[in-house]
Amino acid sequence: MADNACTAPAAGTANALTGRPEWPAWIERKRIDDALTAEAYEKAGPTCRAAIKTATAMFMRYDAPAREVVHEERTDPSSGFWRSRTVFPAPWAVVAFTPEYTAAARLLGAVMPAIITGVPLIAAVCVGGIPSEPLLTALDLAGIEDIFSLSDVELSALLEETQPGPGRLVLLHTGRLDTLRLQARGLHVP
C-alpha cells in the first residue's frame, strides 16, 4: 500500500485530462460492487425508497447545491486595514462508518451537507466490512457513487495522502473508530 501511496495523486488532486478531483488509484480496488447496491435498492421496496428520496429532496429544497467560489474583499481606508477571503467547497469529504451501523437517516444527515455545499469528491467508507443494506440504499438514492470498504489502516493511509488538504471527515460510530478520530485531529482534518 505504501508504494501506491507514493505514486498516486493525493485525494482531491485534479485529473490532468478532466480537471476534476479524484481519489488515489489504489482505492479503486476497495470499491463496493455495484451489484450489492442494486440488490439493496431492490430489497428496500418503493415505500422505503420514496421516504429516503423525500428526505433528500427536503434538504435540497432549503439549500440547493452551490458549487461556487466566493471572493470577498473589505477595506477600511480610515484605519488602513483590508481583509480578503475566498470561500469554496472542500475538495473532498469522507463519511466513515462500521458494518454494524444501520442508521440510514443519520448517514443521510452526515452526507447531505457535503452534497449541498458542492463538495466534488464524496466517499462513503465502511471500515472493516460491507455496509448494511439500508445504508447502501440511502447512499444510492443520495447519488453517492464512491462507496468503499477499507480497513482502519487503509483509511488512515487515505487521510495521510490528503495532507495538506482542507477536506472533511465524518465518523459515524459508537467508539470503534476513536483511533481514526484522534489521527484526523492530529492531521488537522475537521
What are these regions (language model features)?
Residues E73-T137:
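Conserved small-residue-rich beta-alpha loop and adjacent elements
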Residues G143-P190:
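Conserved NAD(P)+-binding/catalytic subdomain of aldehyde/semialdehyde dehydrogenases
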Residues P65-V70, V94-F97, I147:
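Acidic/glycine-enriched edge-of-secondary-structure segments
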Residues F59, D63, A110-V111, L139, ...:
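Hydrophobic, Leu/Ile/Phe/Ala-enriched alpha-helical segments that form helix-helix packing faces
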Residues G118, A142-G143:
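Short, structured coil segments at secondary-structure junctions
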Residues G19, A44, C48-M58, P89, ...:
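General structural feature for long, well-ordered alpha-helical segments within catalytic domains
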